[in-house]
C-alpha cells in the first residue's frame, strides 16, 4: 500500500474502514500529497504488523483532525515525516501510540504550523537515535513539555525547535545531549523571552548561546542568565 493515494490532489475524503491491513509491514507515503483531503476514515490498525509509517500523512494540508486511536505502532521503527506539512492540524492525540521500537523520528511534526496542542507524555523515545527537525516550523505552539523524552540513544537532534516563533515555555529536563557538544536546536526566530527547564548547568551551557535572554530552570530551581 506504499504510495497508494500519493498525490491524489483532488481527493477530499476517504473511507478505508473495511481495508484489511493485518499483513502489511509498510504504509509509506500512502496519503502523501493529498492536499485537499479533509476526512479519512482509517482502517483498524490494532492487529497490524507495520514497521514503517514514513510520510504517511505528509503534506495533507487540509486535514484539521485525525483519529489515531486504533493505531498499533508497537513494531514501528520509523515514522519520519509522518505528519510533516499537515499545516491545518490544530491538535493531535497520540496517547495510543506505542513508540518503544521507534528509532527514526525526524521531521515528525515539521510544518504543522496550526498545532496549538500536542500531548507527548506517552511517547517512548528510549531507542530513538534521530529527532532532527522534530517540531520545526510549528509556529503556533506556545509551550511544549518533553520531560518524559529519554535521549540517551539520540545522536542527532538538530533544529528541533527551528521556526517555533511563538514558544515561550520548553521542558527538556530529561535531555542529556550525550552525543552533542554544541547542539543546534534553536534559530534566530526563537522568541526573545521565555522559560526553559533543563537537567543541569551542563545542559544549559550547551544551548544557552541561542537563547541568552531566557530564564533557565534546573528541575524546580530557577536561575536567571
Which stretches of residues belong to each language-model region?
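Structural signature of tandem-repeat unit edges
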Residues: 9-25, 35-51, 62-77, 88-103, ...
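Low-complexity/repetitive intrinsically disordered segments
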Residues: 1-10
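Predominantly recognizes leucine-rich repeat
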Residues: 6, 32-33, 58-59, 84-85, ...
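Long, ordered, amphipathic alpha-helical scaffolds
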Residues: 187-188
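Extracellular/surface-exposed low-complexity segments
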Residues: 191-225
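Residues marking helix boundaries in flexible regions
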Residues: 22, 31, 41, 57, ...
